[in-house]
C-alpha cells in the first residue's frame, strides 16, 4: 500500500492539494487522478525522459 512509502497524513494533504475548489467530495475522479499523475510525473522527472526512475521517485517522496 502507499502507506508503506508515504505517511497517511501526507497522502491526505496531497489529495487535498489537487482538489478543485468547491468540488471535492472526498473521492478522486478519473479526471482528477489523471491530473495528479501528470503533475507527479512533471515534478519527479528530473532528467526529462518522460519517466520517473527509482532515484527520481525517492527524491520526489523525500522532499
From Swiss-Prot:
| Binding-site residues, Ca(2+) 2 | 45, 47, 49, 51, 56
Top-level taxon in the UniProt lineage:
Eukaryota
Identify the tissues in which this protein is expressed: Detected in muscle and cutaneous mucus. In the skin, detected in cells in the basal region of the glandular epithelium of the dermal mucus glands (at protein level).
Q: Where in the cell is it found?
A: Cytoplasm; Secreted
Which cellular component terms (GO) are annotated to the entry?
Answer: cytoplasm; extracellular region
UniProt key word Hydrolase: no
Q: Where does Ca(2+) 1 bind?
A: 29, 32
- Annotated ranges, domain EF-hand: 28-38, 39-63
Q: Name one GO molecular function term.
A: metal ion binding
The record ties this protein, via InterPro entries, to: EF-hand-dom_pair, EF_Hand_1_Ca_BS
Per UniProt, the keywords (alphabetical) are:
Calcium, Cytoplasm, Metal-binding, Repeat, Secreted
Where is it mainly found? cytoplasm
The function of this protein is:
In muscle, parvalbumin is thought to be involved in relaxation after contraction. It binds two calcium ions.
Q: What does the similarity note say?
A: Belongs to the parvalbumin family.
Q: Spell out the protein name for this chain.
A: Parvalbumin alpha
